[in-house]
Design a protein with these regions (language model features):
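Alpha/beta-hydrolase fold nucleophile elbow
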Residues: 215-225
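Short beta-strand/loop motif that positions the catalytic acidic residue
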Residues: 308-310
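Domain-level recognition of soluble alpha/beta enzyme cores
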Residues: 84-144
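Cap/lid segment of the alpha/beta-hydrolase catalytic domain
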Residues: 150, 154, 174-194, 205, ...
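Alpha/beta-hydrolase active-site loop
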Residues: 189-214, 252-253
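Short glycine-enriched nucleophile-adjacent loop
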Residues: 207, 230-242
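Short alpha-helix in the alpha/beta-hydrolase fold that links the catalytic acid
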Residues: 318-327
C-alpha cells in the first residue's frame, strides 16, 4: 500500500516497510502552485507502517519548472506516440446484450478523433464530445467504466473525454436494474455478480464493433469504477467477496443510506451467479470504492496494478472500512483528498444539475470539483500510461 494525501499544510506518505516500490510519489504528485516541498523532516512507526512527513515552502523557480513540465507532458500527449492530432473526442453508442437477461444494455464509447469536437447536450449533461467525428487512425488502449449505484454511463463523462483526448478509448455502460431510472435490482446477486459480466460483455462488444475493433490495443485494457463500480472492478480483478460482511458493516453505519437501505441484506435472486474475473483487464482505478465486502483473503488473488482515490469526508462510505482497508490489504496506491466527499468524483455539475440534483452537486466550502478533476484526470492518465508501458 502507498497512501498519498493531496497537499495540505503537511503531507503524510505511508508505505509498508516490506514494499518494493520506491518513493516515487514524492516526485510525482501535482502540488498547488503556491508551494513546493522543502524536504522530509520526520518518521513515525505505527502499525508496521512507516509514515514520512514533509514540509513545504514557496519556491517560484521550481513552480515555474513544474508548470513547464506539465505543459511539456500535455504537449507530448497531444502529439501522441503516433504523432497524430487527437484533441477531438467522438462518441458512439455500442450494441451490447446484457448477459443477465439478454436484453439490450445502454453503452457508449468515447474515442480519440482528429476532427473538431463540440459540446453535446445529453439530458442534464454537457458532454465535450461529438457524434459526427470519426475515430483516429491508430491503435488505442481501452478503459471500461462502471458507475456507482443508481448512476449512468454519463456520470463520469469529463474523465472519459479527458482520457480520450490523451489517446484512450473509453467504454461506459449503464448497468441494468442499478441506475438512475431503475434501481430495482440494487443490492441483489444479479447486480453484484451481474455487473462484472456486463462489463465483460461491453468489452467483447467493443472488440467486435465495426468502428472500434481495428483501433483497440487488446493488450492494454483497463478499468475505472466509482463506488459500487469499485466492487465491480475488484471482482473483475479476481477478488472474492463475502456478502455477509455488508450486513455487519451496515449494523455499524446505518446512516450510509444508499448502500445500507436494506440494512446490508443481499437478495439472492440469481443464486447460480458467482464472482467472475476477466483476465483481459490488466489495470484498475477505483474512485471511492465500496470494498468492505472483501476480506484480506478474498483480495489475495488480485495482482493487477491498482490505484485508489477517496475523499476523507466521504459520508456515504466509510473511507477507513473501504478504500483505506482495501489499500492495506493489497499493493494498491491510495490517494486521499482532504475535505472531499463521495460525490466529488462525479463529473462537475451543469447549472441544470445544480438546480435539480443538489445532493450530488453540493461541496464543502473550499472544495473545487473542477480543479480536483483536472488533477486526478492527469494522475489517472499517468497511472494507465505507466501500467501499460506507454512512453
Amino acid at each position: 500500500m502507498n497512501i498519498t494525501k493531496f497537499p495540505t499544510t503537511e503531507e503524510c506518505y505511508v508505505l509498508p516497510k516490506s514494499s518494493k516500490r520506491p518513493w516515487i510519489h514524492l516526485s510525482k504528485n501535482i502540488f498547488p502552485t503556491n508551494s513546493t516541498y522543502l524536504g522530509i523532516f520526520g518518521f513515525e512507526k505505527k502499525q508496521k507502517i512507516l509514515i514520512i512527513r514533509a514540509i513545504r515552502q514557496p519556491d517560484f523557480g521550481r513552480i515555474f519548472l513544474k508548470f513547464m513540465s506539465v505543459i511539456f507532458f500535455l504537449m507530448l500527449h497531444v502529439a501522441g506516440a503516433n504523432a497524430e492530432n487527437t484533441n477531438g473526442v467522438g462518441i458512439k453508442k455500442l450494441e451490447v446484450v446484457n448477459p443477465i437477461d439478454h436484453l439490450p444494455m445502454e453503452t457508449v464509447a468515447f474515442f480519440p478523433s482528429s476532427g473538431r469536437s463540440e459540446v453535446t447536450s445529453i439530458g442534464p449533461y454537457q458532454i465535450a464530445a461529438s457524434r459526427s467525428v470519426s475515430i483516429g487512425s491508430n491503435l488505442y488502449p481501452l478503459i471500461l467504466l462502471s458507475h456507482g449505484n443508481m448512476g449512468s454511463m454519463w456520470g463520469h463523462h469529463d474523465l472519459a473525454t479527458a482520457l480520450a483526448q490523451q489517446g484512450y478509448i473509453v467504454v461506459s455502460v449503464t448497468h441494468p436494474g442499478d441506475n438512475f431510472q431503475n434501481s430495482s435490482l440494487m443490492g441483489s446477486t444479479s447486480t453484484i455478480y451481474g455487473r462484472p459480466l456486463q462489463i465483460s460483455a461491453a468489452l467483447s462488444a467493443a472488440l467486435k464493433d465495426s468502428v472500434l475493433a481495428s483501433h483497440i490495443d487488446k493488450d492494454r485494457i483497463g478499468f475505472l469504477g466509482f463506488s459500487a463500480g469499485g466492487t465491480t472492478g475488484l471482482i473483475l480483478a479476481g477478488g472474492k467477496p463475502t456478502l455477509t460482511r455488508l450486513a455487519e458493516y451496515c449494523a455499524k453505519r446505518p446512516n450510509d443510506h444508499h448502500v445500507c437501505e436494506a440494512k446490508g441484506h443481499i437478495r439472492l435472486n440469481r443464486p447460480e451467479l458467482s464472482p467472475t474475473a476477466d483476465p483481459r483487464i490488466r489495470s484498475f482505478v477505483l474512485l471511492a470504492p465500496l470494498s468492505v465486502i472483501f476480506t484480506p483473503e478474498g483480495l489475495q488473488p488480485i495482482k493487477a496494478p491498482l490505484l485508489i482515490f477517496v475523499g476523507d469526508k466521504d459520508e456515504e462510505l466509510s473511507p477507513d472500512d473501504n478504500a483505506i482497508a482495501l489499500a492495506k490489504s493489497t499493493e494498491a496506491w491510495l490517494q486521499v483528498i482532504p475535505n472531499a466527499g463521495h460525490f466529488t468524483f462525479l463529473s462537475p455539475c451543469s447549472p441544470d444539475m445544480n438546480r435539480t440534483m443538489p445532493d450530488l452537486c453540493a461541496e464543502r466550502k473550499g472544495i473545487d470539483r473542477v480543479a480536483i478533476h483536472q488533477r486526478i484526470n492527469v494522475e489517472i492518465t499517468t497511472f494507465f500510461d505507466e501500467s501499460f508501458g506507454i512512453k
